[in-house]
Amino acid sequence: MKKNSFMLSFLIVLGCDERNPVEVHKAYITLQGQDKVAVVDINAGEVLHYVDVDFTNTGDMPHFVVIDETHNYWYCTLIASGYVLKFDLQTDELVDSVHIGNMPALMALDEEREYLYISRFMPMMGMSTSSQLVHKIDAQNMTIIGTVNVGADSPHGIALSSDGETLWVASNQASHFFKIETDRFGDTSYQPQNFRIGTDVPSSYEINDGFYNALELELSHDDSELYVSCSNSMEVRVFDTESGDSLNTIMTGMMPWHIQLSKDDSELFVSNRMGSSVTVVNLISGNINTLTDDSMSILHGCALSANDDLLLVTSPGSGNAYVFDIENKTLLQTFGFSDVSDTDPMPTGAAIVQ
């Protein structure tokens, strides 16, 4: 009887093990060169499948991705064809789309109110005219419900306050950033408050000085500090969101690109485009570490997992994406996408399901 009870217990445990494999941890990576979005498992290091975003059959170039876990959708910008696409988070099927116009770049998502804010970037290699526009989209029905003209060329970096009332946007060409009241979208007379990134640049935001080339913005989780990656000056600058005053300057690798803050605001992660490395800054102690791999070349996006233990980094130069263990500062996974198509994959945007 005891032997039979032992065997029954063993089979139950074995059955439970088979039913509960290592949890799939899904992430999305835009492959700008292949008109696809890779859906990957960052725990197993496996590509689950590819989502075709060849929306117009003319080369759409998916650039950036954000996830709405509250309503189970994800969104992707197509910088070449000017669309923003909406997908079902469970099935990865296309739900809806909206045409924005030339170069929709980065997005900020207000999950509670279901609004998307889209920055319109500069044209690539003179393909079209520069934009000065930021759009507000009703994500429920994918319609543009308002636009703000910041007055400066190539708005790119974008960050939304936790209450959804303030949108921060930085020009990539003029060394200014803007504080936009989100309820003023659609008001053609509205000019948002602007701040200079440095005292050494023109006071006018209409001058494309190109001194700092701001790339991405991140807000601290209490909304008190704004982090600005300055790709031309190889630094991240930190500003007070009440006064716009400069609080700190953090030196990085060559050409800092996308940035992420840990949930407790204790660490800053910076993908260095030409430095082919990730700078990790302890904002409490000031200590700086570097994450890198010999195969890395021309970095772009980065994304943190829910508990900040994993960092996903994209590398258009190598055609790969990388997953690092933050605590041990070791490389865990490398994703290659070159076998999907003859064209270079150019992984850019990255987002992890939390």
Predicted regions and their residues:
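Predominantly soluble domains enriched in secretory-pathway, periplasmic, or organellar proteins
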Residues: 16-354
